[in-house]
Amino acid sequence: MGEFLSMSIPERGYLLSPVLPVQDIGILYAPRGIGKTFAALSIAVAVASGGAVFNWRAPMPKRTLYVDGEMPATSMQNRLSALVNGMSIPPHTLKNMALITPDLQPCPMPDLSTAGGQAMIEPFLKDVDMVVLDNIATLCRTGKENESQSWQTMQAWLLELRRRGMTVLLIHHAGKSGDQRGTSARKDIMDTVSVCAGPGNTA
């Protein structure tokens, strides 16, 4: 214990200050139609470009991988284009951001709740600082959503990505109660839990 306490361990710092630390596992959830993907893309663009969003600022550009599980490629292109223009970000600063979206893949999107699906994503993780997974429902398809056991393989992978120095932001749907949909065990390893609320709703 004395050896551990005397170790020089660097502070984590932030990818997006003051809300998104380096080496963090976070979840952002909201009801359908509130703007989860818009918020997630805004965060990813800010981190990749070293820009700012929602009064949060990225100290420096970081390599970002955005994995989209459901959006048509044309819709994603339109959203990203509008977002980049609206944030006044020069397109060349987005060289740090990579995108995987279903329409442009030669096969179905991998199931990240399986070891095989995780292995398919691995080649894209080299030198990546942040991974955004949008969303749990479409990218984690094995098992029952309400059973904690079905989350164990995904949980182990997320912890491994964090051990390797990555920040992971998961996007998810809210259930009828307003909490994140499915097993509460998902929150057990989350460092950051955020919810998007509609206008006039501060929940």
PLM regions: where:
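N-terminal pre-Walker A segment at the start of P-loop NTPase domains
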Residues: 1-15
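Conserved inter-motif catalytic segment of the P-loop NTP-binding fold
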Residues: 10, 16, 32, 59-145
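Conserved RecA-like P-loop NTPase ATPase core
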Residues: 20, 44, 66, 134, ...
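Pre-Walker A (Motif I) flank of P-loop NTPase domains
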Residues: 22-26, 62
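Phosphate-binding/switch region of NTP-binding enzymes
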Residues: 27-28, 33, 38, 130, ...
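Hydrophobic positions on the alpha1 helix immediately C-terminal to the Walker A/P-loop
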Residues: 39, 43
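Surface-exposed alpha-helical segments enriched in charged/polar residues
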Residues: 45, 49, 81, 122-126, ...
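Post-Walker A helix-loop "phosphate-sensing" segment adjacent to the P-loop in P-loop NTPases
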Residues: 46-61
